[in-house]
Amino acid sequence: MYKRQGKGFAKTTISDIVQQAGLAKGTFYLYFKDKYDLRDKLIVYKANQLFDDAHRALEKANVSSFEDELLFTTDYIIERFQKNHFFMEFIAKNLSWGIFKSVFTNGDPSFSSQFYDHYMTALKKYNVNCPAPELLLFTMIELIGSTSYNCIHNSQPVSMEEYLPYLHRSLHHILLAFTE
């Protein structure tokens, strides 16, 4: 919404939001503490959709190792970001570890933990000994989000196509660093 008005999130007010949505302010405050709470819930919702979609695509793919699953998922997410720059800006710039973790652990039945559950199961399935699986996931998400954003949005320092082989190698080495 704030993107369409050209204001940016910082200058968008609750009044702008409720007017655009056709709500009363009281109704807004029944569901959200402030505009940041709304933004965080939207990020959680959209990230949940993204990871569920990635999980469904992964289930249909023919992969034979944990690393191949990670690379497939990485490529899937990057492809989605390349197709929808606004979605990428919204998710990649705002998806902190705390928000990401809440997607999978908030206990809200409207959110799925399929991706996270699959990730944990895949570690066992492929006999990957990772003493800190959440830290591994955090590191990969941070790397993928920040580097893909700059390469896709700004083509800096290079295009995503040029960067992708380096990202894959980096993820390979991160996986080695986190596993025994």
Predicted regions and their residues:
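Conserved small/polar residues in nucleotide/adenosyl-binding loops
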Residues: M1-Q5
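Helix-turn-helix
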Residues: G6-D37, K41, Y45
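Short, flexible helix-adjacent loops and helix caps
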Residues: G8-F9, H55-V63, A92-S96, K124-V128, ...
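Short, structured helix-loop boundary elements
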Residues: I14, D40, V44, E67, ...
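Hydrophobic alpha-helical connector segments
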Residues: K41, H55-K83, M140
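Amphipathic alpha-helical packing segments from all-alpha helical-bundle domains
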Residues: N48, D52, I99-N127, E134-F138
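Amphipathic alpha-helical segments used for helix-helix packing
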Residues: D68, R80-S102, D117, Y149-H153
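Hydrophobic/aromatic-rich alpha-helical bundle segments in the mid-to-C-terminal region
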Residues: K124-S170, F178
